[in-house]
Amino acid sequence: MSTLSSLYLGSEPTQVTVEGDQLLVTLADGRTVTIPLQWVSQLSQTEPLPGETQLLILRRPPRVDHVHVTDSALNVYLQDGRMLSCPLAWFPRLLHGTLAERNHYQVLGEDDVIHWSDLDEDVELLRLLEGGKSIESERSIQRWLMSRKVASSAKVAAG
């Protein structure tokens, strides 16, 4: 992994620093690009930048068009024609959901959040672009699975 990734500004970054609420990127050609920190995910002005920093800078935020969930992958189709795919195992609630539950989703926000109300799961597009998976704890998943089992048993007993 390189220390800094190319920003496609005609020159390679040579230094990245945080000053106040701005990210300053100094380029090899001497130019400095200033980016508001709120545009850069998971950085704050109080935390030092990690030794190896990669930046993903987008001209326009991507938008979700539709979603297709298979038994092994979450496939997110973007409005610009691209498709983003990641392992379904990254999202345990989707992995354990039924086909009907997986297919019952809404695109929220500015077309950048996918919400499955039946599974109580939200996936942010930016998190997928960063290669991030669910951060829900194993304990929380186990409680959720147990509550599903209890609800399923109650339906069978009532029916």
What residue spans do the PLM features occupy?
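Motif-centric detector for short Cys/His coordination patterns
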Residues: 1-159
